[in-house]
Amino acid sequence: MKKRFVLLSALFLSFKFIFSQSINPDNVKSISFQKQNENKFSNIFVGTINEKFSLSFDILSGLEHDLYYVIEHCDFNWEKSQLIKSEYIQGFDDVKIDNYSSSFNTYQIYTHYNISFPNSNTSFKKSGNYIIKIIDEYGDEIFRRKFILYENLVTVQTEIKRSREIEFINEKQVVNFEINPINIQLNNPSKTVKVKVFKNNELN
């Protein structure tokens, strides 16, 4: 009976330790993308396939967690595509984030994390929609963000006008655009070309 009590106590202590190390998503702040050599931060990233950029965030904790990133290639509707990992990534993902630092002499204690792409482990082979997931050492997802990589295969001319409907003239706009191929043949464009307009840099 005594041995059983000791075993149960050990299991309880182990569970308590794991629980205390978990990350509350509400404690993740300042999630933002940044293009290399730019001071501007954004909640989305849209760039060329070889463009350098980074994702950074803060965790309001004095602990330095072991965090990893996982990358998924998506279709137009942001569903996971049929491509296997090796078709869109050169190298591999599920890599530990090793660039982090703890705050010093601040009222709010936090740990700052930063991931740069491309890096020695991960670079991109395909353009398209992507989702990056940040997971902890137990495989639990902390948060995810969307980003877009493109290739200059066409030129797009756009024109933005006020809505023609009087009731919405100060609220809505009309977007006219023209797509001109450069290094690609657009066969059946009514089906192969898809267009989406983002409002206020929101991909959702």
Language model: regions and residue ranges:
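Bacterial Sec-dependent N-terminal signal peptides
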Residues: M1-I23
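Low-complexity, Pro/Ser/Thr- and charge-rich linker/hinge segments at domain boundaries
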Residues: I23-D26, L149-V174
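Contiguous beta-strand segments within globular domains
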Residues: I31-H73, F168-P181
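A short beta-turn/strand-edge loop motif at beta-sheet boundaries
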Residues: S61-H65, S123-F124, I184-S190
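Short acidic/polar inter-strand loop motif in beta-rich domains
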Residues: F76-W78, D136-I142, E202
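Ligand-binding face of N-terminal immunoglobulin V-set domains in extracellular IgSF glycoproteins
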Residues: I109-N121, S127, I134
